[in-house]
Amino acid sequence: MLTAFARAFKTPDLRKKLLFTLGIIVIYRIGTHIPIPGVDYSAVQFCIDQTKSNSGLFGLVNMFSGGALLQITIFALGIMPYITASIILQLLTVVIPRLEALKKEGQSGTAKITQYTRYLTVALAVLQGTGLVATARSGALFSQCPQANNIVPDDSIFTTLTMVVTMTAGTAVVMWLGELITDRGIGNGMSILMFISIAATFPSALWSIKEQGDLAGGWIEFGIVIAVGLVMVALVVFVEQAQRRIPVQYAKRMIGRRSYGGTSTYIPLKVNQAGIIPVIFASSLLYIPALVVQFSGSTAGWAAWIQKNLADTAAPAHITVYFFLIIFFAFFYVAISFNPEEVADNMKKYGGFIPGIRAGRPTAEYLSYVLNRITWPGSLYLGLIALVPTMALAPLGANQNFPFGGTSILIIVGVGLETVKQIESQLQQRNYEGFLR
């Protein structure tokens, strides 16, 4: 792989794209350390050192921002507003006929949906930025830190507006950087930035496990985490590559004196057709009750029950609800992202058919049947991959947002495989040996 990478770097066009991508990554990482006005960073650093917490929705967003959220920098919101906007637009495409029509218009329709995604990203950045400022000012961002109320010493409207505008502008810059990578670099820009953000949290998270360990100065716990992480990566790579291939045959057509069609291909249905989306949905939805309790400050019985059973990631109720939410969202997202009837209609239009299955409605029913059968093991795999590392590493101080937890492993492996495949295809075009041998 290293030899192939070296050969890719020797190709002028690929080298230019790789260097451009690396340059954008450096700019992005610099932005995650630039402070915004109105924040007492001595208090922020004190609270970060005191709490060492990375759980819940704040932990999820902090992981996606490369640790910039809890440091309240200009890239504090990271790519989370863009991810949320993309998911919302994808869901609305099923509900709103106008968006569904745009999706079918090809490149022009996709450009329009991308424009809507940008607008929604900025709107969500304003909303999330305001929420972050309010959370930091109230002390809820570091609820266990005695100096949490001193993070934003000036509560004037001007300071609040300045902080929100700065973080919103930072989100717009992150979105622009991601699009630059997509257009002029290697891989999907937002996915690359997500990969880098998660990878940036690895050193500190691993070292904190070592510092909290008691066996052999923490090195045994450190080794256990590395071993579990490598096993999980191998498992995820294996399952993410697994797919059910539905054979498709195209009938021959005579146009003039030439024969067209008659080729054989297949429809690849991945075991994990839903990807990482169900885990993100479940994590976000499950944290909403805890967020309501945190902001309300209530000490009633219902609030205590939520804190005990839903806010605690090690509680049996939290684990059970989290697992079933992942399964539900896996089926839900597959249902809206893959339309068997549309696939069957397109096949029929171009003379394609599945051997032994009639074209049209029987083909759609067969695709739905196969998709449901492979979604079951795929959803169970997602639930287990999200929970097993958490439960196995919980005694060592890890949670579902730990770098070797299910969420981060799924993202890192998925983005890594797609990026390597893209470089592989470009190498093959230049008659080089690829990465995946």
From Swiss-Prot:
It comes from the Bacteria. Coiled coil: none annotated. One of its GO terms (biological process) is protein targeting. It is a multi-pass membrane protein. The keyword Transmembrane helix applies. The chain crosses the membrane at residues 19-39, 69-89, 122-142, 157-177, 189-209, 219-239, 275-295, 318-338, 378-398, 400-420. It is found in: Cell membrane. InterPro entries: SecY, SecY/SEC61-alpha, SecY_CS, SecY_dom_sf. Keywords: Cell membrane, Membrane, Protein transport, Translocation, Transmembrane, Transmembrane helix, Transport. PANTHER family: SECY/SEC61-ALPHA FAMILY MEMBER (PTHR10906). The central subunit of the protein translocation channel SecYEG. Consists of two halves formed by TMs 1-5 and 6-10. These two domains form a lateral gate at the front which open onto the bilayer between TMs 2 and 7, and are clamped together by SecE at the back. The channel is closed by both a pore ring composed of hydrophobic SecY resides and a short helix (helix 2A) on the extracellular side of the membrane which forms a plug. The plug probably moves laterally to allow the channel to open. The ring and the pore may move independently. Belongs to the SecY/SEC61-alpha family. This is Protein translocase subunit SecY. It comes from Streptomyces scabiei. The gene is secY.
